[in-house]
C-alpha cells in the first residue's frame, strides 16, 4: 500500500515528537512512523527534564512552539532551580517527572494534533530518486512517500543491550533494534560510528528503608518551563539521598572482569559526564563514596530510579551492589540497569538545518546525531521539523546563531566539530552565556517564534512592549546621575542601603545585590508601574552590565570579521595555528569569505581568528 504526506517522521521519541508536532502546527501534512505507539514520549532513562544547560534548551523549545516544556509542567513531581546561588547565566531549571503522565500526555497530544497521523510499524529503508529522499518502506510492506523525511531513531539503530555477559539486539530493553534501516544508512555511504549509553536500576518504593536518608525537597516557589503555564502550584514529592560505600566499591572491583565495559564486549564510547558506577569506581579509586539520588518515577511512588548508579554489571552483582547501600538493604529490583550500544551518524554529514549533505530532503535529529539527553533531542527535532516545512514552502531556512540560543550552540558544535562521544549540553559550551540566560528566553526568541507563526499575536504585542520598556528604562537609568547629596543619602538609608561616596548612575546602583524589586520601585518612581518580568530583566542587565556590553562588542567584532573576503588564490598551507584538517578543507572548498569558511565542518572560531590575522598581514605586506 502506498500512502502520501508532506513530511515523514521516523521514531516517536523526544526528537520525533517535536519534529512531527511543529511541522503539523506549521501546516504540513505529517505522518509519524513508530514501532510502538504506547512508548511515544517514554523517558527511557532518568525521570527528569531540564538541568544545567538542558533547562535552557527546554525553555527555548517552548518559546519556539515546542511541547516539552508544557508537558513537563503538567507532569512534574518536583521542581528546582539548580545553581540558584550563582549568577543567572548558569542557573538551570530541572523537574522530576511522572514518567507515566508525561508519556500519556505526549502520546495523546501527538494522536490528537490536526495534520498529523501515526502508524505502528518499523521503517526498513529509504526510497531515493536522483539523490533525493522521496519516502520509506516498512516491515509490513507499506510504502510511504513524502517530500521530506526526518529520522529520529534514538538508540534503535543496530542497538545492542548489555547486561553482564548477556547481549540482546534491542533498541531499548525488551524492544526490537532497527537493523534493516541501520544497514540501509551504512549502504548509502554515511559515516557511521558506535556510541554507548546506559541506565540505572529501579527498585520497588515499598522495599526502601527511608529512615536515616537525607530528604531532598523541591523549591518553595517552584519554577516552571512554559511561558504558557498559568496558576502553577504543583504537588511536589521528595527525593532521597544515599551513598555508595567501601563495601559497594569492593563488590564492583571484584567483578570488573565481568563488566562489559572492561571486558571488551562494549566498543562504543559512553557519555563522559554520566559514567557508569563501575567506571566511576575505576577512574576515581581514591573516593570512598559516591552520591546517589532515589527519585520517584510516578506520583504513586511505586518505583524509584537510583540516579548515579548506571551500570551494565551482571544481575547477581547488581543485587549485591544495591543491597550494600544504606536504605536499599532489602530493596526489590524491578528493573535492572543495562548499557546499550547503537549506531550514530557523524553530524558533520549535516548542514545547519539538520538536512544531510548527501541526500536532499533527509533530516536527522536526536541521538542519531551523537547527542545524549531528552532536551538535546527535542531541540534538534524541533529545528528539523521547522526547516523541513520552510524548505517545502521554498522559504529561507531557520538557523539560530551561537549568540542567540543554546540550540544554536548545540547544532553548530555538532556540524562543525562532530563528536566521538555522546554530546550533552552545558552552560560552559556557550561563549555568550550571559546573553543566553533562561530568564530572557522569550525576549531572545519571541520575534523568531512570531515570524514563524508559532506565537499568538496578542502575546507577542505584550512581549514587544515589555522589550521596549526594558530598553527605554535601561537608557534612562544610564543617564540618571546620582550624587551623594543629603536627600539621596537619606533615601538610601531609609531603604537600608549603604551610602554612595561618589557620583554614580542608576545602573551602578541597581547592580547591588541588595537592591530588590521593591527597592527599585521605591527609589526610582518611573520603575514603579513596570511588571515583574520587565523589572527582572532590568535588574539582571544592570548587575552584569559591563560583561554584557563586552559580549555584545565581541559579537559585533565577530560579525565584522565574518564579512572579510579571502583573496583569490590565498594559500592556506603553512599558516601557523591551522591544523592539517583545516588546511585540507579550506583548500578543497576555497571559501570566498570568512563567513563561508565558518560554514565548513571542522573549521573552528580559533581557525577563523588565525585566518583573519594572516589575511590582514598579507594584505599589509
UniProtKB/Swiss-Prot annotation:
Its main location: cytoplasm. Changing residue 105 to F: In strain: 60190. Keywords: Cytoplasm, FAD, Flavoprotein, NAD, tRNA processing. Its cofactor is FAD. The keyword Ribonucleoprotein does not apply. Pfam families: GIDA, GIDA_C_1st, SAM_GIDA_C. It is found in: Cytoplasm. InterPro entries: FAD/NAD-bd_sf, GIDA_C_N, MnmG, MnmG-rel, MnmG-rel_CS, MnmG_C, MnmG_C_subdom, MnmG_C_subdom_sf. Signal peptide: none annotated. Changing residue 10 to I: In strain: 60190. The keyword Manganese does not apply. Changing residue 353 to A: In strain: 60190. NAD(+) binds at residues 270-284. Changing residue 457 to Q: In strain: 60190. SUPFAM superfamilies: FAD/NAD(P)-binding domain. Transmembrane segments: none annotated. FAD binds at residues 11-16. One of its GO terms (molecular function) is flavin adenine dinucleotide binding. Homodimer. Heterotetramer of two MnmE and two MnmG subunits. NCBIfam families: mnmG_gidA. This is tRNA uridine 5-carboxymethylaminomethyl modification enzyme MnmG. The gene is mnmG.
Amino acid at each position: 500500500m502506498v500512502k502520501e504526506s508532506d513530511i515523514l517522521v521516523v521514531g516517536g521519541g523526544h526528537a520525533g515528537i517535536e519534529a512531527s508536532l511543529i511541522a503539523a502546527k506549521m501546516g504540513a501534512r505529517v505522518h509519524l512512523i513508530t514501532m510502538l505507539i504506547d512508548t511515544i514520549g517514554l523517558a527511557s532513562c532518568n525521570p527528569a527534564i531540564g538541568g544545567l544547560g538542558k533547562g535552557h534548551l527546554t525553555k527555548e523549545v517552548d518559546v519556539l512552539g515546542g511541547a516539552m516544556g508544557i508537558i513537563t509542567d503538567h507532569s512534574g513531581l518536583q521542581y528546582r532551580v539548580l545553581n540558584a546561588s550563582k549568577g543567572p547565566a548558569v542557573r538551570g531549571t530541572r523537574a522530576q517527572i511522572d514518567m507515566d503522565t508525561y508519556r500519556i500526555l505526549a502520546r495523546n497530544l501527538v494522536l490528537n494534533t490536526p495534520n498529523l497521523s501515526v502508524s505502528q510499524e518499523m521503517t526498513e529503508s529509504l526510497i531515493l530518486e536522483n539523490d533525493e529522499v522521496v519516502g520509506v518502506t516498512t516491515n509490513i510492506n507499506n510504502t510511504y512517500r513524502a517530500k521530506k523525511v526526518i529520522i529520529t531513531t534514538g538508540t534503535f539503530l543496530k542497538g545492542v543491550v548489555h547486561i553482564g555477559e548477556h547481549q540482546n539486539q534491542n533498541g531499548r530493553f525488551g524492544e526490537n533494534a532497527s537493523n534493516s534501516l541501520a544497514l540501509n544508512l551504512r549502504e548509502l555511504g554515511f559515516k557511521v560510528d558506535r556510541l554507548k549509553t546506559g541506565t540505572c536500576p529501579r527498585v520497588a518504593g515499598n522495599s526502601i528503608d527511608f529512615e536515616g536518608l537525607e530528604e531532598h525537597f523541591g523549591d518553595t516557589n517552584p519554577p516552571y518551563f512554559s511561558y504558557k503555564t498559568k496558576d502553577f502550584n504543583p504537588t511536589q514529592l521528595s527525593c532521597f539521598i544515599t551513598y555508595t560505600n567501601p563495601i559497594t566499591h569492593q563488590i564492583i572491583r571484584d567483578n570488573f572482569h565481568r563488566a562489559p565495559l572492561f571486558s571488551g564486549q562494549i566498543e562504543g564510547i559512553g557519555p563522559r559526564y554520566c559514567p557508569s558506577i563501575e567506571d566511576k569506581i575505576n577512574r576515581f579509586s581514591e573516593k570512598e563514596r559516591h552520591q546517589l539520588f532515589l527519585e520517584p518515577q510516578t506520583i504513586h511512588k511505586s518505583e524509584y530510579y537510583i540516579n548515579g548508579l548506571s551500570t551494565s554489571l551482571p544481575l547477581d552483582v547488581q543485587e549485591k551492589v544495591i543491597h550494600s547501600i544504606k536504605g536499599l538493604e532489602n530493596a526489590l529490583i524491578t528493573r535492572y540497569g543495562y548499557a546499550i550500544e547503537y549506531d550514530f551518524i557523524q553530524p558533520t554529514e549535516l548542514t545547519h538545518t539538520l538536512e544531510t549533505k548527501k541526500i536532499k530532503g533527509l533530516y536527522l535529529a536526536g541521538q542519531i546525531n551523537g547527542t545524549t539527553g531528552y532536551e538535546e533531542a527535542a531541540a534538534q527535532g524541533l529545528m528539523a521539523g521547522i526547516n523541513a516545512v520552510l524548505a517545502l514552502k521554498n522559504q529561507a531556512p531557520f538557523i539560530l546563531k551561537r549568540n542567540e540560543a543554546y540550540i544554536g550552540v548545540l547544532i553548530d558544535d555538532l556540524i562543525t566539530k562532530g563528536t566521538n562521544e555522546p554530546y550533552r549540553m552545558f552552560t560552559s559550551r556557550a561563549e555568550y552565556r550571559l546573553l543566553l540566560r533562561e530568564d530572557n528566553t522569550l525576549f531572545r526568541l519571541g520575534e523568531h517564534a512570531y515570524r514563524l507563526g508559532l506565537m499568538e499575536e496578542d502575546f507577542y504585542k505584550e512581549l514587544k512592549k515589555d522589550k521596549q520598556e526594558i530598553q527605554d528604562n535601561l537608557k534612562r537609568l544610564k543617564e540618571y546621575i546620582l550624587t551623594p547629596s543629603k536627600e539621596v543619602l537619606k533615601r538610601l538609608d531609609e531603604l537600608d542601603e549603604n551610602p554612595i561616596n561618589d557620583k554614580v548612575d542608576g545602573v551602578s546602583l541597581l547592580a547591588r545585590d541588595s537592591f530588590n524589586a521593591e527597592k527599585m520601585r521605591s527609589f526610582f518612581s518611573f520603575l514603579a508601574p513596570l511588571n515583574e518580568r520587565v523589572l527582572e530583566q532590568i535588574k539582571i542587565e544592570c548587575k552584569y552590565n559591563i560583561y554584557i556590553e563586552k559580549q555584545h562588542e565581541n559579537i559585533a567584532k565577530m560579525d565584522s570579521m565574518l564579512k572579510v573576503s579571502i583573496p583569490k588564490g590565498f594559500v592556506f598551507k603553512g599558516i601557523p595555528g591551522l591544523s592539517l584538517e583545516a588546511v585540507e578543507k579550506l583548500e578543497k572548498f576555497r571559501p570566498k569569505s570568512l563567513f563561508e569558511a565558518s560554514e565548513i565542518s571542522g573549521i573552528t572560531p580559533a581557525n577563523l581568528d588565525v585566518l583573519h590575522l594572516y589575511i590582514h598581514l598579507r594584505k599589509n605586506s
